[in-house]
A protein has these predicted regions:
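Membrane-proximal alpha-helical signals and transmembrane carboxylates
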Residues: 1-174
């Protein structure tokens, strides 16, 4: 999962990176299966430069499943910068599910019942249901389409943490 928000100095990106030893079944009992990296900068290019200087692994956004946006980045000015950044990232697929939250930090540090990452959990809500139970998610393709039409974003499902639970509001689409 990738989270995007506004910080005092510009923007913040949160990367939830699953531990590959967990994904391959080689986890150690005391290790956290998901790590969250938070980086901030004046713009998204600066954040990416900080990532490239500080991380040994290539930032592969080709496996991105979920994009979670804080409420401030949805405002005019910030959303244009975000859409511009996402469109130039050629590895981000348009079938990524998009959510909004006013609890970006809490959502990214939420621990699922099976210690799944936030991205895996939200993607599972979308895709692992019988046809009658499926939720209508909003994809990045729909975000791009509406943004190109009139400069706004579609209504996005909201996600938040309530106690130990992660809750999702799909609005009238439920």
């Amino acid at each position: 999962a990738l989270g995007a928000g506004v910080s005092e100095n510009g923007f913040v990106l949160k990367y939830a990176m699953p531990d590959m030893s967990t994904a391959t079944g080689q986890e150690k009992p005391d290790e956290d299966p998901v790590s969250v990296l938070t980086l901030s900068g004046r713009d998204f290019q600066e954040i990416e430069a900080v990532y490239n200087r500080s991380q040994e692994k290539f930032l592969d956004l080709g496996h991105l499943e979920v994009l979670i946006l804080d409420e401030q980045i949805l405002e005019e000015g910030a959303r244009e910068a975000l859409i511009g950044y996402l469109k130039q990232e050629e590895h981000i697929g348009e079938d990524v599910y998009v959510f909004r939250t006013d609890m970006l930090g809490d959502v990214f540090h939420w621990k699922g019942a099976r210690k799944s990452s936030i991205g895996e959990y939200l993607q599972g809500i979308q895709e692992n249901r019988t046809s009658g139970q499926q939720k209508k998610g909003v994809t990045l393709r729909e975000v791009y389409h509406q943004f190109c039409q009139d400069g706004t974003l579609p209504w996005l499902p909201e996600v938040w943490v309530e106690g130990e639970l992660l809750e999702v509001d799909y609005g009238s689409n439920e």
